[in-house]
Amino acid sequence: MKNVFFAAFFGAACCLSGCRQEAATPATGEHYAFAEEMFRKVWDMYRVPEYGLFSEYYPNSYRPDVNYFDDGAKSTQEVSFLWPMDGVFTSAVALAEVDPVKYGCYVDSMVIAVEQYYDDGRMPAGYQAYPVRMGKVDRYYDDNGLVGL
């Protein structure tokens, strides 16, 4: 029951950076195979299908109290903050660069997922830390920067 979500995708993205190839060349090699395996595991084990989003914990029923909020400890939400979910998005984009046919649908899914964090009810409009449907929460410049990148 460890929070390996971010570490898994950071590792997968790092592995992909070493196997970048021309678009017409099929990807091969152990780095690409590892990136695909990690992507598949995170997609299968951390995805919360009813929202099209991801959990920060496995199993998804694990809900530790988090104590890094100014107003005290809270129980974790059913889905992740925006920034780790953006790591999944980045991994999907990196894999789609190598194999657009296989991973293009994942990128499309992630575009829809990220939009769930978009808050246009406050000015200026921007992406908030949790999906809008789960309530109004803080918006951070670095989250919005990650989405922009």
Question: Where does each model-flagged region fall?
Answer:
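Generic hydrophobic secondary-structure signal
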Residues: 9, 16, 89, 93, ...
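Low-complexity, Ser/Thr/Pro/Gly-enriched N-terminal "stalk/linker" regions
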Residues: 21-134
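Bacterial Sec-dependent N-terminal signal peptides
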Residues: 1-27
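Aromatic-rich carbohydrate-recognition surfaces in CAZymes
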Residues: 78-85, 137-149
